[in-house]
Amino acid sequence: MSKYIISEKALEDINNIWIFTAENWSVEQANRYYNIILDEIEFIAENFETAKDFGHIRKDYRYSKAKSHLVFFRKTKHNEIEVVRVLHEKMDIKNRLID
């Protein structure tokens, strides 16, 4: 397994996704969705180059889709994969990635 790190903002995103899903659907659905997101993170950590380039918005960023969410990654200077954010596809992605 390739090494990856998850930023504080991405952890907050994932936590908020779980809470929203549990409150609006069910804990079981929240757990399933959480696992889908983590599976995508692990896949990209192993296959970084398969993620789509997002450099037109943020230099060196890539993303991959996990259901209705986009998982944003970059490589660190130590060649680790950093999960930067996990955002819903209908959010204002550009502004969310700036903050």
Predicted regions and their residues:
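Enriched for short, Lys/Arg-rich terminal
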Residues: 74-99
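Short proline/glycine- and basic residue-enriched helix-capping loop/turn segments at helix->loop/beta transitions
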Residues: 42-46
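Arg/Lys-rich, positively charged N-terminal/basic patches that mediate binding to nucleic acids
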Residues: 1-34
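Basic/aromatic recognition patch in beta-strand/loop cores that engages polyanionic ligands
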Residues: 49-78
